[in-house]
Amino acid sequence: MTKQPEDWLDDVPGDDIEDEDDEIIWVSKSEIKRDAEELKQLGAEMVELGKNALDKLSLDPDLRSAIELAQRIKKEGRRRQLQLIGKMLRQRDVEPIRQALDKLKNRHNQQVALFHKLEQIRDRLIEQGDDAVAEVLNLWPDVDRQQLRSLIRNAKKEKEGNKPPKSARLIFQYLRELAENEG
């Protein structure tokens, strides 16, 4: 038996792992599956978008055509197409797509919040009358005071007479126009 020099252990491959600066990051199989499912859900969200919303996203032609195809497919084929879209997303940087989707969702949420605010203002106008008109004048100085008071008067009469709230709808539309002209 031949003796080896004592430094033979230094030449073993893989022994120098602790000397490297690069860390090995172990990712579990279930984490990979969770990420893949998340990307598939992102693809499903994009499939639910309309053509105008898709135009606002910066998508490459292959991904765009896959999404448009998924919009036309029903049942089992759609599931397979969504998996393909998820696979395509794994090969791309999805952060810009996520940001654009968040922007679209946020715009919708802002619009819903604005409508709720306008409904509250309308209800206050009908209930409180002139006090609430002063608040509206503070928000929108260019309000036609006479038209607004006329609508409020009609809305109160309709409410007392249990009639359909036509004037209340007109108040809401008028407030929405004011809000849109402001922004």
Swiss-Prot record:
<comment type="function">
    <text>Member of a network of 50S ribosomal subunit biogenesis factors which assembles along the 30S-50S interface, preventing incorrect 23S rRNA structures from forming. Promotes peptidyl transferase center (PTC) maturation.</text>
</comment>
<dbReference type="GO" id="GO:0043022">
    <property type="term" value="F:ribosome binding"/>
</dbReference>
<keyword id="KW-0963">Cytoplasm</keyword>
<keyword id="KW-0690">Ribosome biogenesis</keyword>
<dbReference type="GO" id="GO:0019843">
    <property type="term" value="F:rRNA binding"/>
</dbReference>
<dbReference type="GO" id="GO:1902626">
    <property type="term" value="P:assembly of large subunit precursor of preribosome"/>
</dbReference>
<comment type="similarity">
    <text>Belongs to the DarP family.</text>
</comment>
<keyword id="KW-0699">rRNA-binding</keyword>
<protein>
    <recommendedName>
        <fullName>Dual-action ribosomal maturation protein DarP</fullName>
    </recommendedName>
</protein>
<dbReference type="InterPro" id="IPR023153">
    <property type="entry name" value="DarP_sf"/>
</dbReference>
<dbReference type="Pfam" id="PF04751">
    <property type="entry name" value="DarP"/>
</dbReference>
<dbReference type="InterPro" id="IPR006839">
    <property type="entry name" value="DarP"/>
</dbReference>
<dbReference type="GO" id="GO:0005829">
    <property type="term" value="C:cytosol"/>
</dbReference>
<keyword id="KW-0694">RNA-binding</keyword>
